[in-house]
Amino acid sequence: MPSRRACGAPDPKGRTMEQYKQEFIEFMVESDVLKFGEFTLKSGRTSPFFMNAGAYVTGDQLHRLGIYYARAIHDAFGLDFDVVFGPAYKGIPLSVVTTMAMHELYGKEARYCSNRKEAKDHGDAGILLGSPLKNGDRVVMVEDVTTSGKSIEETYPIITSQADIEVKGLMVSLNRMEVGRGGTMAALDEVRERYGFPTAAIVDMEEVTAHLHGRKVRGRVVIDDGIKAALDAYYERYGAVKEA
C-alpha cells in the first residue's frame, strides 16, 4: 500500500548509502548550495530547506560537481549514450562539467548540448548550444533539481524536434521528494510517467536528512532536532506518496 514516510526514516530495504553520495551531501552544505532554515519557494510553500545550484562558482566546485553527476549517471543509466543535454540556464554548465567528468572517469567521449532561451538568427544560428543533435543520438538530460517539471516541459519538445533522438534518462542532483503539480507523485516521478524515460537523482532528501541529522559539517550540526522536526512536518504535509 502507498504510504507517506517521514523524510529521513530508515530505508526499509536496509540499503547502505554509497560513499560518494555521503560526500556529495556534505559538499552541497560546504558550498552553501543546500541550506536549512525557513524559505519561501516560488510555489508559495514555506520550506525548511533551500537549494541554489548557482552557488557552485569555483573551478574546484564545478569539477567535483561534474564528477558526482558522472558517477550517478554511470550507476543509473550506464554509458550507452551520446549526448549530455542541460536545459538553459543552469543546465548549461552542468552539461559541460558532466561531459568532461565522463571523459575523465570512464574515457567516455560524449558531446554536450544545451538550448538557448531565444533562437539566434546569425552566426551559429539556431536554438541549440554546443553539439547539434543527430538522428539516432541517445541523450541524457541533467538538471539541478526538478520541482514542477516545467523546464522539461519546455525543453523536451525542443530537442525531440531537432532530430530523431532517444532520451535515456534525466539526472538531477537532489530529489526534493515532495508532490508535484499532480498532487500525489514526486515531480521526478511525474516526469517519468509523462515522458516515458527514467529519472534519477544523485541523492534524495530522505538520504540527506538521514546523513546530516546530528552530524557536524564545518564545525556545526547541520540538522539538529528542531530542523529535523520541521522537515518531518513539511513532508507530512507535502511529501510524495511512496511505495512501502
Show the residue positions of the predicted features:
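Cationic, amphipathic, low-complexity alpha-helical segments enriched
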Residues: 1-9
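PRPP-associated nucleotide enzymes
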Residues: 3, 13-142, 147-244
